[in-house]
């Protein structure tokens, strides 16, 4: 809670005193502040003391996701935990930047967690920063509830990285199919093979998933030959012309061939997504 007082007003900039400290606010943001005036206002400042975002914390679980607005232009160095109670349900907005900013990543990690009434709320985890609404990372599969998918479609997020850490759901696969322009999809190794297995009959794998599944599994299961073999047999159901995919595929094949000591007499060829083993 801060004591905010308008000192002088201008066409583009207002001089404002907040807890006896002077800040210069964009006139548009000041109008937004007046519009949202109340006890539950979030003021976000950059490291030069300039207000970059004004947001109301009077948001509701997922039916009207005003919370997402909070992260759009968040540049503050020292944002603390904000807790708001709505209808006796505690909804947490956890944003801890401080020393955890990783500029080269350029996004927050957002996940969905259950709240007391069984509904869902967005939760922002530390470790990342956000530059704009077009670069958001969703973690976990609960995020793919129907309303979340609708919301993401509505705000038109062009660049989205998808990190799946739990189970596969129909909504997850539907979401992936709707967003085939994903820059990349990062898959938890524990579910990579499950996705491949599921995709055999559903025919929903995209090139991005194939690449990251193969790369992740090959790298992390490099000494688990049975898993590598299962992976290679799974991806034969997928056709791709991606050089990155076949590079990973080739690494896995090479390790398997070495493992069975048939490198000199056993050649493995692949073309158009089909593996040909030739003795």
Feature-to-residue mapping (PLM):
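Intrinsic disorder/low-complexity polar-acidic segments
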Residues: 65-279
């Amino acid at each position: 809670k801060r004591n905010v007082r308008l000192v002088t007003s201008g066409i583009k900039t207002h001089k404002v005193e907040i807890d006896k400290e002077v800040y210069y606010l964009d006139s548009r943001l000041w109008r937004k502040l007046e519009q949202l005036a109340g006890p539950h206002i979030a003021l976000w400042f950059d490291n030069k003391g300039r207000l970059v975002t004004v947001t109301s914390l009077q948001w509701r679980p997922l039916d009207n996701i005003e919370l997402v607005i909070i992260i759009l232009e968040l540049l503050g160095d020292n944002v603390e935990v904000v807790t708001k109670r709505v209808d006796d349900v505690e909804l947490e907005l956890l944003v801890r930047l401080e020393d955890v900013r990783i500029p080269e990543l350029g996004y927050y990690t957002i996940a969905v967690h259950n709240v007391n009434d069984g509904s869902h709320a967005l939760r922002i985890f530390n470790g990342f920063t956000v530059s704009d609404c077009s670069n958001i990372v969703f973690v976990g599969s609960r995020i793919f509830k129907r309303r979340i998918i609708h919301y993401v479609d509505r705000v038109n997020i062009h660049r989205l990285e998808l990190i799946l850490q739990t189970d596969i759901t129909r909504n997850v696969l539907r979401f992936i199919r709707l967003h085939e322009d994903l820059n990349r999809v990062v898959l938890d190794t524990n579910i990579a093979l499950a996705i491949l297995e599921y995709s055999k009959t559903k025919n929903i794998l995209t090139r991005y998933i194939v690449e990251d599944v193969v790369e992740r599994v090959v790298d992390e299961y490099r000494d688990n030959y049975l898993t590598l073999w299962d992976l290679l047999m799974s991806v034969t159901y997928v056709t791709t012309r991606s050089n990155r995919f076949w590079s990973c595929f080739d690494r896995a094949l090479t390790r398997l061939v070495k493992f069975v000591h048939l490198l000199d007499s056993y050649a493995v060829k692949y073309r158009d997504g089909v593996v040909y083993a030739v003795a």
